[in-house]
Amino acid sequence: MRSETVKKGYQRAPNRALLRSLGVTDREMDLPFIGIANAYNNIVPGHLHLRSISQKVQEGVAAAGAVPFEFGTIGICDGIAMGHEGMRYSLPSRENIADAVELMVEAHRFDGLVCVCTCDKIVPGMLMAAVRCNIPAIVVTGGPMLPGYAAGRELSLIDVFEGVGRVAAGTMSEEELGELECAAMPGCGSCQGLYTANTMACVTEALGLSLPGCAAIPAVDAAKLRIARESGERVVGLVREGVRPRDLVTPKSLANAIRVDMALGGSSNTVLHLMAVAREAAVPLDLEAFNAVAEVTPHICHMMPGGPHSMLALYRAGGIPAVLKMLERHLDDAPTVSGRSILEIAKGARVADPDVIRTTDAPVSPAGGLKIVRGSLAPDGAVVKCAAVPEAMWRHRGPARVFDGEGAAMEAILHREIAEGDVLVIRYEGPRGGPGMPEMLSPTSALMGLGYARVALVTDGRFSGGTRGPCIGHIAPEAAVGGPIALVEDGDEIVIDLYAKSLDLAVERATLEERRKTWKPPARRLTGMLARYVQTVEQANLGAVQR
């Protein structure tokens, strides 16, 4: 066992003395040591309940004959960080979490690892750490929040974001927005639709790193406590069997994860995160792999924000095992932490609600929910969640309205300075330019709330999993490094064709070269972590990982 490095031999008497001060007994010195990375805090709704989940994991570890040691990691709530300077810190926190877990695992020589996490950057950060450390590991995701409810319909956080636009449009009063604000979020858990946190939980299960069914179980359901205990027991089995994350994160399992993502119509952020996880596993994964899978994987679940169904509906319909059941003929068989293969899990599943999880013969759409687009505006690629784009906007040509940053764009939107047909360009919001590649949920939600139907938005920043509408993000190269998006001027024609997977700037190359002669990136003064981050972060088409 790895942990023998700190507990065997007379030379380790000082190490053992410290362990004994924790209450570790002679008998326990001979057992596997399991690290439990718990991202609990009381500022993130998705993490508020993780203490109870971690406690059940610890009980499971002990029951299976190992010793649990809990440690903490940070976690940022993207919703609370949204729309201000705080959002610049969200994506960088992914790398911080991965590094922090690695530090604890390697310093203390744990034999196994359980990652207890829920929200947007915490799940991928812990996945990266688990694969990087490559000790037997299992992930327990905290589960979705129950939907809010008012006026006879289910609510989610996106209703509140879009309510801001409705107030600006005069179609909702501030009092009504206040009532919505108080009804939308009834308790702990990740935001209720197929936004980034829940998409990552589903992807983790499809990768084979969570027990079957874990992703969709609501945060407040006792089934979450049971699967947490089972996960604690199972990680001890993985230690004894010698099954490691890199045995599970393979080209086949990554393809399965992308298939599930496409079938669900998941968040565009999964492109960044899966590429980052693949890099830790030394598995080649590029943007074209997402298009290749999307073209042969039907979109079979019409989930919020593009559709009507919440994560609660997905859970009641059978969760990810039922989705795997419908995708069975599209899947590559691959092992999972459960000890059963992905096809065994699919064969044993049942679809309880065919309106929520459709067959591949009667899908929402014949192709997957994400597309990678390229063209003169995005030579190295960009990402669009086509599952949330009305088909009437799959082809669009319009004049650019250019904003150097989200704040200026938001002000113009709320003051109704945008015309139908415009293409909003929000730039200098990429990995280096933001820095931190902030999400543009506030402007996209404001556009929806104001009732704009034919306004597109393109950016080198990111979009929340809650974004809906014709929004293309992750444009690479970004403006800060001189990508074509830096050269766009007001009135330039931008051509979007999602059928052709293209995004073009209808400006002569010679004109762009003239503009480049006078282009300079905006000067800005950065300090602290962000100053270090911009020196090492890669472009979005490489997963925005740090070198």
Curated annotation (Swiss-Prot):
Q: Name one GO biological process term.
A: isoleucine biosynthetic process
Needed co-factor(s): [2Fe-2S] cluster; Mg(2+)
What molecular functions are annotated in GO for this chain?
A: 2 iron, 2 sulfur cluster binding; dihydroxy-acid dehydratase activity; magnesium ion binding
Statement: the UniProt record of this protein carries the keyword Amino-acid biosynthesis: yes
Name the pathway it acts in: Amino-acid biosynthesis; L-isoleucine biosynthesis; L-isoleucine from 2-oxobutanoate: step 3/4; Amino-acid biosynthesis; L-valine biosynthesis; L-valine from pyruvate: step 3/4
State the InterPro entries in the record: Dihydro-acid_dehy_C, DihydroxyA_deHydtase, DiOHA_6PGluconate_deHydtase_CS, ILV_EDD_C, ILV_EDD_N, IlvD/EDD_N
Looking up PROSITE patterns in the UniProt record yields:
ILVD_EDD_1, ILVD_EDD_2
Q: Which reaction does it catalyse?
A: (2R)-2,3-dihydroxy-3-methylbutanoate = 3-methyl-2-oxobutanoate + H2O; (2R,3R)-2,3-dihydroxy-3-methylpentanoate = (S)-3-methyl-2-oxopentanoate + H2O
Which annotated residues bind [2Fe-2S] cluster? C119, C191
Q: Which UniProt keywords apply?
A: 2Fe-2S, Amino-acid biosynthesis, Branched-chain amino acid biosynthesis, Iron, Iron-sulfur, Lyase, Magnesium, Metal-binding
Its EC number is: 4.2.1.9
User: According to its record, what are the GO cellular component terms?
Assistant: cytosol
Task: Relate the protein's function as given in its record.
Answer: Functions in the biosynthesis of branched-chain amino acids. Catalyzes the dehydration of (2R,3R)-2,3-dihydroxy-3-methylpentanoate (2,3-dihydroxy-3-methylvalerate) into 2-oxo-3-methylpentanoate (2-oxo-3-methylvalerate) and of (2R)-2,3-dihydroxy-3-methylbutanoate (2,3-dihydroxyisovalerate) into 2-oxo-3-methylbutanoate (2-oxoisovalerate), the penultimate precursor to L-isoleucine and L-valine, respectively.
Task: Please state which protein family the record places this protein in.
Answer: Belongs to the IlvD/Edd family.
Q: Which NCBIfam families match?
A: ilvD, PRK00911.1
The protein here is known as: Dihydroxy-acid dehydratase
Which species expresses this protein natively? Answer: Methanoculleus marisnigri (strain ATCC 35101 / DSM 1498 / JR1)
Q: Which gene encodes it?
A: ilvD
